[in-house]
């Protein structure tokens, strides 16, 4: 039996893992002739379902973390530039004007 199947993340499939392991240990000919295939198919289905559930949970957790990080960034930006980043908007406009003026001066020479 694969050691990764005994992991905590597949705890929901423990019954299927034990059933397949028991079938494999009973009689060797059952294993050879594929008489344990029903147990194996059930285990594969359970593992796939468990894996999908783990992926869904991970996506949800990452979205929650991302939203929290973005809230923190917005709070830091508001502390630095004021509400709705008004100061940043003004500074960006002034920077754009200066850059345009310097470009115009360079082009006129």
Swiss-Prot record:
InterPro entries: Cyt_c_biogenesis_Cmc1-like. The gene is CMC2. Pfam families: Cmc1. One of its GO terms (cellular component) is mitochondrial inner membrane. Residues 10-54 form the CHCH domain. Present with 279 molecules/cell in log phase SD medium. This is COX assembly mitochondrial protein 2. Keywords: Chaperone, Copper, Disulfide bond, Membrane, Metal-binding, Mitochondrion, Mitochondrion inner membrane, Repeat. GO terms for molecular function: metal ion binding. Its main location: mitochondrion. The twin Cx9C motifs are involved in the recognition by the mitochondrial MIA40-ERV1 disulfide relay system and the subsequent transfer of disulfide bonds by dithiol/disulfide exchange reactions to the newly imported protein. The lineage of its organism: Eukaryota, Fungi, Dikarya, Ascomycota, Saccharomycotina. Disulfide bonds join 13-46, 23-36. It comes from Saccharomyces cerevisiae (strain ATCC 204508 / S288c). A motif (Cx9C motif 2) lies at residues 36-46. It is found in: Mitochondrion inner membrane; Mitochondrion intermembrane space. The keyword Transferase does not apply. It is a peripheral membrane protein. GO terms for biological process: mitochondrial cytochrome c oxidase assembly; mitochondrial respiratory chain complex assembly. A motif (Cx9C motif 1) lies at residues 13-23. Required for mitochondrial cytochrome c oxidase (COX) assembly and respiration. May be involved in copper trafficking and distribution to mitochondrial COX and SOD1. Belongs to the CMC family.
């Amino acid at each position: 039996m694969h050691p990764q199947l005994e992991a905590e993340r597949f705890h929901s499939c423990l019954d299927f893992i034990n059933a397949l392991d028991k079938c494999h240990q009973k009689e060797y000919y059952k294993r050879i002739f594929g008489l344990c295939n029903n147990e194996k198919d059930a285990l594969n289905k359970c593992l796939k379902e468990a894996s999908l559930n783990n992926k869904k949970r991970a996506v949800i957790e990452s979205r929650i973390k991302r939203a929290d990080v973005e809230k923190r960034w917005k709070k830091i930006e508001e502390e630095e530039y004021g509400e709705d980043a008004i100061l940043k908007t003004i500074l960006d406009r002034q920077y754009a004007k200066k850059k345009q003026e310097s470009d115009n001066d360079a082009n006129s020479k």
